[in-house]
Each structure stands twice: as structure tokens, then as C-alpha cells.
């Protein structure tokens, strides 16, 4: 939790860090990724058979090594909008017998050369957990049950045996399953009303948890503060008594919300992720309201929020049907840093967050035939995923604030926008980690930092100006490591992200 006191421009800023005040445990799944059959994410990104940089499975080795640097804990698959017409059975078995299908989300052709077994094997090579999204567009409950049985079944059943026939004896034990993707959207095949979806999701969840009670189910929400989110939570957040047990089984483990932010001007761009912070706060209250109104027993585990699509994305600048290949600048990197600060600050409520996407498609990581490019947005992800773990701890900032335009406009009325955006953690290793993002375009900010004593390791991400990118053959934005003796105030450079790290 970070609190804020607004100062005048003439007053001296300060930051106080309190490692003894632990707020909540951080779920490492907030650093999850996403791989959709869209653009060059799968074909030419994750999977590139015949390329000298690929292994015997066709997996790009340089992509695997890069994602290992990010310690990605979970990858969502196969979409996204793609899931609404995807039939998993097309993507298993001998490749020469897999059908090519028209793909209606991004208007391409899906060859099905990369499917369930390839993805789950790729996850094992990467060392990450899979998160599969069920087709609640053209798909059926029988198809969903079959997919769970194919992945997780241990009995002598048709689909578990089909998995064995296809070369995988042991179950994959896929834990996370989404009940559809953005089924409320007018762009979806088989768009649903909230009433239709809530009824369907409830019935599907019962059946899926009867088949495999160990799985966790993610409800399809909208942006969070909407009537869709309230209604679907209210209608599905009920204890269900299994005929096999007298204990109450929670149907819904997480509630999914999505949001993308972007603006052509720097300051509206870097303050836009605060809309996500307010969305999390409201969604958390809706979860509590549904539990209260439905009389859910307090001992039943409270669902968390699964922010399983988030990023900086301007769909005009990077059109989805054309592969959505963004060229990110320093301003976008700082916006991603603010997004990640939000997830750390709200760790009590966020059980998972998946940046969309992990390779090539609005991604921090781009591939060419000859290698990879780490975009500006790579560096905040790298720092957070490697250091901002453990516990969220209390921090207080005193600084002046940006008072101009926000995007969306309603952010101005509901969130403070200080010049310094801050989150703080205490790791299991006993180190305090503090991220400070100076969003000011033109001015470094000198602030007294209460908390550290002795040597402080400092990581800084910045560049010549907010518009510089790494996509023009030169790395304009990277990572610089220095040391600081913690004497006197610290100057946070203009348009920069700084991570300070010291032993508590």
C-alpha cells in the first residue's frame, strides 16, 4: 500500500518506506504472460521450425532463454478472441492429419501445426504453468470436458487414452482454465448477454469441477466497474455441494478483467494505468458484495482478480488484424512500470496478471529470422519479475502532482497523479525493493528517502527523451546499475524508472 501527501512545487519531496508493515503477499503470477494464435506470436515467434535458432521441437531457443530471464510463472493460451472458434481437437495427433481452418478473430488461416501438446511441452521446457482458455463461442460443454480430460485425466477414458496414444503417458495437470474470453464483446463469435453468460458459466463450472476438483476456474469479466462484472459475479459466486462430498466447493476461483491503455502524449500515457488501479478496487468490492448477498461462508476462499489482458496498446498504431506489432518508446516503458506498480500495490486482490502478449504481438520481445529485440517495455518487466516479489510493504510519498489531462478523463476525478509513482516490497531474501517512476518529462526530482542505511543498489531505466525506442537498430533504452551510499536525498532522473534495493 502506498499513501500520498500532495505538496506544493516549492516543498521538499520525501519517500518513507516501512519494511515492518507488511500489507499482503505478492502472488508471483502477476508476472504471467500470454500467447495467442495472432500475428507472429505463435508461428514465427514461439514456434519456428526450420529456423537455425529453433530446437528439435521447433521452439525458438532465443525466445525461451529470454522468457526465462523474465521468470514467467504462467502463460495464457490459445487466446484471446481466437478461442471463440478454436476447437482443440484439431490441434492434436499427427500433424499431417490436422485440418487447416478459417480463423475468424484475426481473419487468417489456422494450420493447427502448433496445438495443445506442443504448447504444454513448450511450457515444460520454459518452466512455466499453462493457463488454458475454453471456447465459449462455438464450443460446447462436452468439448470443454473432453479437453480437461485430455490434459488431466488419469483414468481409462477415451480422451485420456487419446493423450497417451499421442505420446504423453502422464497427465499435464493443467490447473488454470478460463470460462471464455470477452464473450460480452460485439466482435465475438456467439456474443453473449450477461444473463446468458452467467447461466452458462455456472453450469459449465459445476461440470468441470465435478470432473476435476483440483482445477481453478476464471470467470469472464469485463473492465471491472461494470454491470456485467457485478451480475456475473452475483450469479456464479455460490457454494455448490458435490454429490461426492459434503463440503462446499467454490466454483469460481478468479474473476478476469481486461484493460489496455495508450495515449500519444507522454503524461496522459503514463498516468492511464491508474484507471486499472481503480478498476481493481471496484472489482474487489463487487466480489465482496456478491459474497455478502449470496451468504457465502467466510471460510470459503475469496476469489481474486485475474487481470489476464493488460498492456499499453494503441490499436490504430498497431492494428490487430495486421499482427499488432507495436514499436514501444520510453514513455510506454514507464507506463508499463506504472501498470506493474499498480499490481504490486494491489497484491491483496490480484491473483494473476498476464501481459498481452509474450512474443511479437504488442510485446516487449520481438523476433527476426536472425535473433530477438528487447523493446523498451522489456526492462520494467525484467526488474519487477526479478526483484518485486515477496510482500507488499507500506510506503508514503510526499510530492507535488501532475494536474493536467488524463486518459481516460475520469481518472482525474478518482485518482491522485503524483509526479513520483511508487511501490515497495520486502523479499524472502530480506531485501527491500522500491520502484520509483518519475513521470516528469523535463525535471529530475530530488527526494529524501527514509528507510535505507548502508549501500543501496540502484537500477535505472531511462533514455534521452520519452520518444526514443529500441526498434531502430540501436538500444536507446536499457538498464544501468549503480551504487548509492544512502547519504542525503536521491535525485530521480526525469522520465525514468528507478529500482532501489537494500538489506532490511
Swiss-Prot record:
SUPFAM superfamilies: (Trans)glycosidases, Glycosyl hydrolase domain
Disulfide bond residue pairs: none
Entry-linked Pfam families: Alpha-L-AF_C (PF06964)
Gene Ontology process terms (BP): arabinan catabolic process; arabinose metabolic process; L-arabinose metabolic process; pectin catabolic process; polysaccharide catabolic process
Pathway annotation: Glycan metabolism; L-arabinan degradation
Main localization of the protein described in the UniProt heading: secreted
SMART domains: Alpha-L-AF_C
Positions bearing carbohydrate: 81, 152, 269, 329
Keywords noted in UniProt: Carbohydrate metabolism, Glycoprotein, Glycosidase, Hydrolase, Polysaccharide degradation, Secreted, Signal
InterPro entries with a match to the protein in the record: Alpha-L-AF_C, Glyco_hydro_b, Glycoside_hydrolase_SF
Transmembrane stretches, start-end: none
GO molecular function, one term: alpha-L-arabinofuranosidase activity
Known EC number: 3.2.1.55
Catalytic activity field: Hydrolysis of terminal non-reducing alpha-L-arabinofuranoside residues in alpha-L-arabinosides
Subcellular location(s) per record: Secreted
Any one Gene Ontology cellular component term annotated for this protein: extracellular region
Superkingdom to which the source organism belongs: Eukaryota
Family per similarity comment: Belongs to the glycosyl hydrolase 51 family.
Protein purpose: Alpha-L-arabinofuranosidase involved in the degradation of arabinoxylan, a major component of plant hemicellulose. Acts only on small linear 1,5-alpha-linked L-arabinofuranosyl oligosaccharides.
Name the UniProt record assigns to this protein: Alpha-L-arabinofuranosidase C
Record lineage: Eukaryota, Fungi, Dikarya, Ascomycota, Pezizomycotina
